[in-house]
Swiss-Prot record:
One biological process term in Gene Ontology: regulation of DNA-templated DNA replication initiation
Keyword set includes Cytoplasm: yes
Function (record text): Required for the proper function of SLD3 at the initiation of DNA replication. Binds to SLD3 and reduces its affinity for CDC45, a component of the replication fork. Required for mitochondrial morphology.
Keywords associated with the record: Cell cycle, Cytoplasm, Cytoskeleton, DNA replication, Nucleus
GO CC, one annotated term: nucleus
Similarity comment: family membership: Belongs to the SLD7 family.
Pfam families in alphabetical order: Sld7_C, Sld7_N
Organism: Saccharomyces cerevisiae (strain Lalvin EC1118 / Prise de mousse) (Baker's yeast)
Subunit structure and binding partners: Interacts with SLD3.
Protein name, UniProt field: Mitochondrial morphogenesis protein SLD7
RNA-binding in keyword set: no
Protein backbone atom coordinates (compact mmCIF):
# COMPACT_ATOMS: atom_id res chain seq x y z
CA UNK A 1 0.00 0.00 0.00
CA UNK A 2 1.37 3.40 -1.01
CA UNK A 3 2.12 5.96 1.69
CA UNK A 4 3.03 9.61 1.44
CA UNK A 5 6.54 10.16 2.81
CA UNK A 6 7.14 13.86 2.39
CA UNK A 7 6.53 16.99 0.34
CA UNK A 8 9.36 18.57 -1.64
CA UNK A 9 9.71 22.25 -2.57
CA UNK A 10 12.75 23.34 -4.57
CA UNK A 11 14.04 26.63 -5.94
CA UNK A 12 14.92 27.44 -9.54
CA UNK A 13 17.31 30.32 -10.11
CA UNK A 14 17.40 32.10 -13.45
CA UNK A 15 17.75 35.42 -15.20
CA UNK A 16 14.29 36.46 -14.11
CA UNK A 17 14.96 35.70 -10.43
CA UNK A 18 13.99 32.70 -8.29
CA UNK A 19 10.96 30.47 -8.77
CA UNK A 20 9.87 27.85 -6.22
CA UNK A 21 8.41 24.58 -7.51
CA UNK A 22 6.03 23.51 -4.74
CA UNK A 23 3.93 20.60 -3.52
CA UNK A 24 5.84 17.65 -4.98
CA UNK A 25 4.57 14.70 -2.96
CA UNK A 26 6.85 11.66 -2.63
CA UNK A 27 5.06 8.33 -2.17
CA UNK A 28 6.50 4.88 -1.49
CA UNK A 29 5.20 1.32 -1.72
CA UNK A 30 7.67 0.11 0.92
CA UNK A 31 6.83 0.13 4.64
CA UNK A 32 8.55 2.81 6.75
CA UNK A 33 9.04 3.20 10.48
CA UNK A 34 7.87 6.80 10.62
CA UNK A 35 4.18 7.56 10.21
CA UNK A 36 4.58 11.32 9.97
CA UNK A 37 5.27 13.21 6.76
CA UNK A 38 8.00 15.81 6.52
CA UNK A 39 8.72 18.71 4.23
CA UNK A 40 11.96 18.85 2.28
CA UNK A 41 13.52 21.95 0.75
CA UNK A 42 15.96 21.87 -2.11
CA UNK A 43 17.81 23.76 -4.81
CA UNK A 44 17.86 22.91 -8.53
CA UNK A 45 21.40 21.95 -9.60
CA UNK A 46 21.25 20.83 -13.24
CA UNK A 47 19.69 18.57 -15.85
CA UNK A 48 21.42 15.23 -16.57
CA UNK A 49 21.31 12.43 -19.12
CA UNK A 50 20.31 9.34 -17.12
CA UNK A 51 22.09 7.06 -19.60
CA UNK A 52 25.42 8.76 -18.81
CA UNK A 53 25.23 8.58 -15.01
CA UNK A 54 27.89 6.47 -13.24
CA UNK A 55 26.72 3.02 -12.17
CA UNK A 56 27.35 3.81 -8.50
CA UNK A 57 24.77 6.63 -8.49
CA UNK A 58 21.90 4.18 -8.17
CA UNK A 59 22.22 0.97 -6.14
CA UNK A 60 20.11 -2.13 -6.82
CA UNK A 61 18.27 -1.97 -3.47
CA UNK A 62 17.54 1.74 -3.67
CA UNK A 63 14.02 3.05 -3.16
CA UNK A 64 12.28 4.71 -6.07
CA UNK A 65 9.55 7.14 -5.06
CA UNK A 66 6.46 8.08 -7.03
CA UNK A 67 5.97 11.84 -7.41
CA UNK A 68 2.64 13.67 -7.54
CA UNK A 69 1.72 17.34 -7.48
CA UNK A 70 -1.48 19.35 -7.50
CA UNK A 71 0.44 22.50 -8.42
CA UNK A 72 -0.23 23.65 -11.97
CA UNK A 73 3.20 25.33 -12.03
CA UNK A 74 4.97 22.12 -11.02
CA UNK A 75 3.02 20.05 -13.55
CA UNK A 76 3.83 22.49 -16.35
CA UNK A 77 7.50 22.58 -15.35
CA UNK A 78 7.92 18.79 -15.38
CA UNK A 79 5.97 18.46 -18.62
CA UNK A 80 8.28 21.00 -20.27
CA UNK A 81 11.61 19.83 -18.86
CA UNK A 82 11.11 16.04 -18.88
CA UNK A 83 9.94 15.54 -22.45
CA UNK A 84 13.08 13.53 -23.09
CA UNK A 85 12.74 10.09 -21.47
CA UNK A 86 16.45 9.98 -20.56
CA UNK A 87 16.50 13.37 -18.87
CA UNK A 88 16.70 13.85 -15.12
CA UNK A 89 16.49 16.85 -12.79
CA UNK A 90 19.10 16.98 -10.00
CA UNK A 91 17.97 18.57 -6.73
CA UNK A 92 20.30 19.24 -3.78
CA UNK A 93 18.39 18.92 -0.51
CA UNK A 94 19.00 21.93 1.73
CA UNK A 95 18.32 20.34 5.10
CA UNK A 96 19.40 16.73 4.62
CA UNK A 97 22.72 14.90 4.26
CA UNK A 98 23.53 11.39 3.09
CA UNK A 99 23.74 9.37 6.32
CA UNK A 100 26.45 7.03 5.10
CA UNK A 101 28.82 9.52 3.45
CA UNK A 102 27.82 12.67 5.40
CA UNK A 103 27.78 14.61 2.12
CA UNK A 104 24.89 16.72 0.76
CA UNK A 105 21.96 14.55 -0.31
CA UNK A 106 20.69 14.71 -3.88
CA UNK A 107 17.46 13.62 -5.54
CA UNK A 108 17.06 12.91 -9.25
CA UNK A 109 13.54 13.35 -10.64
CA UNK A 110 12.76 11.60 -13.92
CA UNK A 111 9.86 10.43 -16.06
CA UNK A 112 9.22 6.74 -16.65
CA UNK A 113 6.57 6.40 -19.36
CA UNK A 114 3.69 8.48 -17.97
CA UNK A 115 4.80 8.38 -14.34
CA UNK A 116 6.99 10.86 -12.47
CA UNK A 117 9.54 9.19 -10.17
CA UNK A 118 12.62 10.11 -8.17
CA UNK A 119 15.45 8.46 -6.26
CA UNK A 120 18.16 9.61 -3.88
CA UNK A 121 21.70 9.50 -5.27
CA UNK A 122 23.76 6.82 -3.51
CA UNK A 123 27.11 8.40 -2.61
CA UNK A 124 28.47 5.37 -0.75
CA UNK A 125 30.54 4.02 -3.64
CA UNK A 126 31.89 7.47 -4.49
CA UNK A 127 32.98 7.87 -0.87
CA UNK A 128 34.76 4.50 -1.02
CA UNK A 129 36.44 5.38 -4.34
CA UNK A 130 37.62 8.71 -2.93
CA UNK A 131 39.08 6.92 0.09
CA UNK A 132 40.91 4.40 -2.11
CA UNK A 133 42.32 7.17 -4.32
CA UNK A 134 43.54 9.10 -1.26
CA UNK A 135 45.18 5.96 0.12
CA UNK A 136 46.83 5.22 -3.23
CA UNK A 137 48.21 8.77 -3.45
CA UNK A 138 49.68 8.42 0.04
CA UNK A 139 51.34 5.11 -0.88
CA UNK A 140 52.77 6.59 -4.09
CA UNK A 141 54.09 9.55 -2.09
CA UNK A 142 55.87 7.21 0.33
CA UNK A 143 57.36 5.21 -2.56
CA UNK A 144 58.68 8.34 -4.28
CA UNK A 145 60.20 9.59 -1.02
CA UNK A 146 62.21 6.38 -0.69
CA UNK A 147 63.64 6.42 -4.22
CA UNK A 148 67.46 6.24 -4.13
CA UNK A 149 69.92 8.10 -6.37
CA UNK A 150 70.19 4.99 -8.55
CA UNK A 151 66.50 5.35 -9.28
CA UNK A 152 66.78 8.92 -10.60
CA UNK A 153 66.59 7.65 -14.21
CA UNK A 154 63.03 6.54 -13.49
CA UNK A 155 62.17 10.08 -12.40
CA UNK A 156 63.66 11.50 -15.61
CA UNK A 157 61.64 9.06 -17.72
CA UNK A 158 58.51 9.85 -15.76
CA UNK A 159 59.01 13.60 -16.25
CA UNK A 160 59.48 13.05 -19.99
CA UNK A 161 56.27 11.03 -20.13
CA UNK A 162 54.42 13.74 -18.20
CA UNK A 163 55.60 16.37 -20.70
CA UNK A 164 54.29 14.24 -23.57
CA UNK A 165 50.99 13.76 -21.78
CA UNK A 166 50.82 17.51 -21.17
CA UNK A 167 51.25 18.17 -24.91
CA UNK A 168 48.51 15.68 -25.79
CA UNK A 169 46.25 17.20 -23.13
CA UNK A 170 46.76 20.67 -24.60
CA UNK A 171 45.84 19.42 -28.09
CA UNK A 172 42.77 17.65 -26.71
CA UNK A 173 41.80 20.80 -24.82
CA UNK A 174 41.93 22.90 -27.99
CA UNK A 175 39.88 20.34 -29.91
CA UNK A 176 37.35 20.25 -27.07
CA UNK A 177 37.07 24.06 -27.09
CA UNK A 178 36.52 24.08 -30.86
CA UNK A 179 33.86 21.38 -30.54
CA UNK A 180 32.00 23.40 -27.89
CA UNK A 181 32.07 26.54 -30.03
CA UNK A 182 30.89 24.58 -33.09
CA UNK A 183 28.07 23.06 -31.03
CA UNK A 184 27.07 26.55 -29.86
CA UNK A 185 26.98 27.85 -33.45
CA UNK A 186 24.96 24.87 -34.72
CA UNK A 187 22.43 25.08 -31.89
CA UNK A 188 22.08 28.84 -32.29
CA UNK A 189 21.59 28.51 -36.06
CA UNK A 190 18.88 25.85 -35.65
CA UNK A 191 17.05 27.93 -33.04
CA UNK A 192 17.06 31.03 -35.25
CA UNK A 193 15.88 29.13 -38.35
CA UNK A 194 13.18 27.40 -36.30
CA UNK A 195 12.07 30.70 -34.79
CA UNK A 196 11.81 32.31 -38.22
CA UNK A 197 9.76 29.38 -39.55
CA UNK A 198 7.38 29.56 -36.59
CA UNK A 199 6.81 33.22 -37.40
CA UNK A 200 6.03 32.43 -41.02
CA UNK A 201 9.11 34.25 -42.33
CA UNK A 202 10.19 32.60 -45.57
CA UNK A 203 13.78 32.54 -46.76
CA UNK A 204 12.56 34.08 -50.00
CA UNK A 205 11.98 37.39 -48.20
CA UNK A 206 14.54 40.06 -49.09
CA UNK A 207 15.68 40.76 -45.52
CA UNK A 208 15.72 37.08 -44.43
CA UNK A 209 19.52 36.74 -44.46
CA UNK A 210 19.94 40.13 -42.80
CA UNK A 211 17.48 39.21 -40.01
CA UNK A 212 19.25 35.87 -39.51
CA UNK A 213 22.68 37.51 -39.27
CA UNK A 214 21.76 40.29 -36.84
CA UNK A 215 19.98 37.75 -34.60
CA UNK A 216 23.03 35.46 -34.70
CA UNK A 217 25.45 38.31 -33.93
CA UNK A 218 23.25 39.68 -31.13
CA UNK A 219 22.96 36.22 -29.51
CA UNK A 220 26.74 35.80 -29.63
CA UNK A 221 27.14 39.20 -27.98
CA UNK A 222 24.61 38.30 -25.28
CA UNK A 223 26.58 35.16 -24.35
CA UNK A 224 30.03 36.72 -24.89
CA UNK A 225 31.10 36.10 -21.28
CA UNK A 226 30.26 32.39 -21.42
CA UNK A 227 31.98 32.04 -24.82
CA UNK A 228 35.06 33.80 -23.48
CA UNK A 229 35.27 31.39 -20.55
CA UNK A 230 34.80 28.43 -22.90
CA UNK A 231 37.66 29.72 -25.10
CA UNK A 232 39.84 29.72 -21.96
CA UNK A 233 39.08 26.05 -21.30
CA UNK A 234 36.12 26.26 -18.94
CA UNK A 235 34.02 23.09 -18.71
CA UNK A 236 30.79 25.06 -18.64
CA UNK A 237 28.40 25.17 -21.60
CA UNK A 238 25.75 27.60 -22.74
CA UNK A 239 22.56 25.71 -21.91
CA UNK A 240 19.96 25.02 -24.58
CA UNK A 241 17.26 26.68 -22.48
CA UNK A 242 19.30 29.86 -22.03
CA UNK A 243 20.12 30.10 -25.74
CA UNK A 244 16.51 29.41 -26.70
CA UNK A 245 15.33 32.20 -24.38
CA UNK A 246 17.84 34.61 -25.93
CA UNK A 247 16.77 33.81 -29.50
CA UNK A 248 13.08 34.14 -28.67
CA UNK A 249 13.66 37.54 -27.04
CA UNK A 250 15.71 38.81 -29.99
CA UNK A 251 13.24 37.59 -32.63
CA UNK A 252 10.36 39.22 -30.77
CA UNK A 253 12.33 42.46 -30.80
CA UNK A 254 13.51 42.29 -34.43
CA UNK A 255 10.22 41.10 -35.95
CA UNK A 256 7.94 43.69 -34.35
CA UNK A 257 5.78 45.32 -37.02
Amino acid sequence: MSRKLCTLNFTLSGKQGSLVIRDIQLWSNRPTASKSTSELRGQFIQYVDLAKLPLWVRSTNMNTYRCYSTSATAQAYFKSKLRNANRGIVIELSDKVDQRSQEPAYLIIFREKTELNCFQVDLTMKHEFDGQVTKLKQEIGKTRASVSKEGSIDIIIQQSQQRKIGTKTKVYRNVHINDKRLQFNETLSKLILGGLRLRGISNSITDYQKLYKITFDAAEFTHRDELKRISMGSVEEVSFESLQETVETLLKLFTKS
